Amino acid sequence: MNKDFCIKNKKFQSRLILGTGRYRSLLEAKQSIEASGCDIVTVAIRRINADNIGFIKSLIKLINWQKYWLLPNTAGCQTAEEAIRVANLGQEIAKQLGQVDNNFVKLEVIPANKYLFPDPIGTLKAAEHLVKQGFVVLPYINSDPILAKQLEDIGCSAVMPLASAIGSGQGLKNIDNIRIIVEASKVPVIVDAGIGVPSEATQVMEIGADAVLINTAVAQCKVPVAMANAMRLAVAAGYEAHSAGRIPIKNYARTSSPNFDRIGQI
């Protein structure tokens, strides 16, 4: 059983991706990343501003970038044009960290601040441009099977459908659509946003998702380091369960012990 997780030609061992936002302290963020066992860490490039630049710079310095792969993301970008600019900035930051061959980007185009649903047209437009530039594009999308296929067709290296509204902890509101995306996709499906507890991470892995991205569920819980470890175990369990193959669902009962050679029949 091949346990490696591949995006484009890059192999990763962990199928859990961890975000770096909303932690209460640098130490908590660093310890959570370590406890998660992740290989990929995502950082919101657009949200590096005067208020948090010290935190982000310090976090970047704390992380061993020879061990972790940076996934720059364009969170906070409201248009395709803005997302394209931020993607290029993220690529430069990756190079400065020594990852000269890192052209990954988690593409987010979100025009409204209240519900934070991604713009499908803006995402498609930005993705097409970035793919032509040579980026490994991982678009964050609503759980729309048609859009997921269109993004795959233009050359995106993965798709990232949301489970529910980002940061909401509402869980798996769109599980049926995600299942369709998983069944139809020839690129990795990474479920992102809305997952609140480890059992939900396990469930999406059980239906065949390739990986899960978690941020708020870890960063904002009572004990982030413990939750990061729980998510690590949950994702691994879900992957193993899917690989093992569940039993068929039946409409009737069936005993687990044999009916022959029972006491009284011997």
UniProtKB/Swiss-Prot annotation:
Transmembrane segments: none
Pathway assigned in UniProt: Cofactor biosynthesis; thiamine diphosphate biosynthesis
Organism annotation: Cyanidium caldarium (Red alga)
CDD domains for this protein: ThiG
EC number: 2.8.1.10
Protein name: Thiazole synthase
Claim: Lipoprotein is one of the keywords in the record: no
Disulfide feature: none
Record keywords: Chloroplast, Plastid, Schiff base, Thiamine biosynthesis, Transferase
InterPro entries to which the protein is assigned, alphabetical: Aldolase_TIM, Thiazole_synthase_ThiG, ThiG
Subcellular location: Plastid, Chloroplast
Active site residues of this protein: K106 (schiff-base intermediate with dxp)
